[in-house]
């Protein structure tokens, strides 16, 4: 058993010798003889031939070596095939992961850029809306002040008309009393008050009346009284018409202000709501941008990790492929040597014997 193992080891070493198919058996053996391991195996062969030992034992060992080499290659092929499938699965997964991260980076970059643009537009618009709110509030205040001034003017003028109409009515009563025969002296105090009130108004409408009343104070006659009563009636009618016109103007202005103030209020509400929406949007935009930037950084790191993993896997696969090819080539060379030795031992035994005899004489 020990002898068989020794021969197996020596022959296996010889199997690694570099030879070419174009060489003759003697040349093959000569090449093997130049190698220290080859010299050893040939010494064993020479001993076998000299002692008449069975060459078949060496043939069996060579057959076992060939079988071992073929078996190792089949195992290596199976492992290589399994590793290739696993590698392709890993590569496909990594490429898919890389594509996913690249897609995410593009999407996040677009989100960051579009949101940044939207943020800028919102910030510009919120400044415009803020200015519009200020203008709206100023317009409301100005128009409200104008309306209040109009109303105050109407109140004042309406009160003046009431006072003037009361003065006209009082004057009509005095004149009617004079017409009825009441002495002027009895009505003088009332007359002077009415006259003073009419003069305070400084209205051109009352100038003819004031002149007529002044004349009536110095001379009372029925003709003058009739003219004054007619004049008083005309003036009162004009005052009534003027007061009605002022009231109509007041009501029209009040109605217009109600519509205008409602419009301004609605516009103010809309602007305030728009500003609140924009301010909330600005906050959300900033949050979105921050999150997009952070996610973009994460996705970039994930992409780099995946690309590094892919590079490592590709290097590993290249190394495995190179190792597999080298080992396959080595086994092929070893198998070729074994096959040539088998050929020498089986088909060219006479040439081997001749060479060994010559070798014995020389060495």
From Swiss-Prot:
Q: Any idea which UniProt keywords this protein has?
A: Coiled coil, Signal
State its location(s).
Trichocyst
Q: How is it modified after translation?
A: Two components are produced by post-translational processing from the precursor peptide.
- Residues forming the propeptide are 18-52, 190-221
Coiled-coil zones: 85-119, 244-352
Q: Residues of the signal sequence?
A: 1-17
Its GO CC terms are: trichocyst
Q: Does the keyword Mitochondrion apply?
A: no
Indicate yes or no for the key word GTP-binding: no
Question: Record's family?
Answer: Belongs to the TMP family.
Function, in words = Structural protein that crystallize inside the trichocyst matrix.
Name of the molecule in the record = Trichocyst matrix protein T4-B
Question: From which source organism is this entry?
Answer: Paramecium tetraurelia
The lineage is: Eukaryota, Sar, Alveolata, Ciliophora, Intramacronucleata
